[in-house]
């Protein structure tokens, strides 16, 4: 399918998220939408996918104007989208998730599980996805869950596949594997729109690049464009790609962890005899492939998990927090941003002010008798 977006404008109140955007995606092309966070890339693709209705402009597929009233219409027209936050049901199998919404049925409307499995196996084998149709989503690593989302789109005969920040949750190895999958899909005739702000990945896999800044298309480029040229288009000024980093002068120890072991949710040892110190004014990186204990260690420091055995201990600003509650850890000066901010960090139905006061709602300035003092939210 040849996809053409003409004059797409989308407003949210006074904010113009997309301003008269023109975009052409050729059949079998990997087309990168490059821009900073908040540039309007995802909004544009949500218009394409039928999640938003454009205030102006139109969409054409192979020269035929489209009018999508929702994602169902977009999918029927051959548009698929893999969102940054996956749309999967954790307690369902791969086959059940892929079939959801267009389930193959037998007599009396009973789901044909064998056919659902077969569809997953066929797509998986065709593109080398190596996905078990009977595996539960909650048991799969993030990279495999992303492949399930791609299989789900392909099972609905997607001819244009939108990938929204697909590498944000992937390891470098998984990123390389995804790029190879993208190349295979493009070779089979599928057009791919790759939303990202990562220049290295764009140059490695894209056939063509469109740069969006502040809701407008500011340029197009080939992947052989220089990194500095692309970066300047993204931000609207010259970008210095090298930084003279001054050597840090760390102060006293503020966080000390000694011989800590922690179990994961399956009662397996995720953290084994770990010790480290963080000094005042220091940035300490804990590197490793996802699933190797980093999350469990962070949750222990917050007070969500207890240490294993009696030998391990941790202290914050000289105060032991080995068995502290979450409130005690926060009151001791620990800040925490969870791995999955959408699921574990924010309440999407709450306002910004309400989210900001969540972990402080028990403090006197936010209380009024036994109730929360909502008037204090914006002070």
In which residue ranges do the predicted regions lie?
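Glycine-rich phosphate-binding loops of nucleotide-dependent enzymes
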Residues: 1-379
């Amino acid at each position: 399918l040849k996809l053409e977006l003409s004059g797409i404008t989308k407003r949210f109140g006074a904010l113009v998220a997309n301003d008269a955007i023109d975009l052409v995606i050729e059949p079998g092309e990997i087309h990168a939408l490059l821009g900073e966070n908040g540039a309007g890339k995802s909004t544009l693709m949500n218009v394409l996918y039928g999640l938003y209705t454009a205030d102006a402009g139109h969409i054409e597929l192979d020269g035929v104007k489209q009018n999508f009233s929702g994602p169902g219409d977009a999918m029927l027209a051959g548009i698929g989208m893999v969102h940054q936050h996956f749309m999967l049901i954790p307690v369902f199998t791969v086959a059940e998730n892929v079939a959801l919404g267009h389930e193959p049925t037998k007599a009396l409307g009973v789901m044909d599980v064998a056919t659902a499995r077969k569809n997953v196996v066929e797509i998986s084998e065709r593109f080398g996805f190596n996905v078990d149709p009977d595996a539960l989503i909650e048991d799969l690593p993030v990279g495999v869950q992303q492949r399930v989302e791609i299989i789900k789109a392909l099972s609905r005969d997607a001819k244009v596949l939108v990938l929204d920040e697909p590498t944000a949750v992937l390891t470098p190895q998984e990123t390389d594997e995804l790029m190879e999958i993208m190349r295979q899909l493009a070779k089979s005739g599928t057009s791919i729109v790759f939303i990202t702000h990562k220049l290295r990945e764009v140059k490695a896999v894209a056939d063509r690049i469109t740069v969006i800044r502040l809701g407008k298309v500011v340029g197009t480029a080939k992947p052989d464009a220089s990194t500095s040229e692309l970066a300047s288009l993204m931000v609207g000024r010259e970008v210095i790609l090298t930084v003279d980093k001054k050597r840090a002068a760390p102060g006293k120890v503020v966080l000390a962890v000694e011989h800590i072991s922690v179990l994961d949710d399956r009662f397996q040892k995720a953290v084994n005899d770990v010790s480290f110190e963080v000094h005042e004014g220091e940035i300490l990186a804990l590197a490793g492939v996802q699933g190797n204990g980093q999350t469990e260690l962070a949750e222990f420091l917050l007070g969500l998990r207890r240490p294993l055995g009696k030998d391990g201990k941790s202290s914050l600003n000289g105060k032991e927090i080995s068995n502290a509650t979450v409130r005690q850890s926060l009151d001791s000066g620990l800040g925490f941003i969870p791995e999955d901010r959408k699921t574990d960090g924010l309440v999407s139905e709450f306002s910004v002010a309400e989210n900001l006061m969540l972990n402080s709602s028990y403090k006197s300035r936010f209380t009024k008798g036994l109730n929360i003092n909502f008037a204090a939210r914006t002070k």
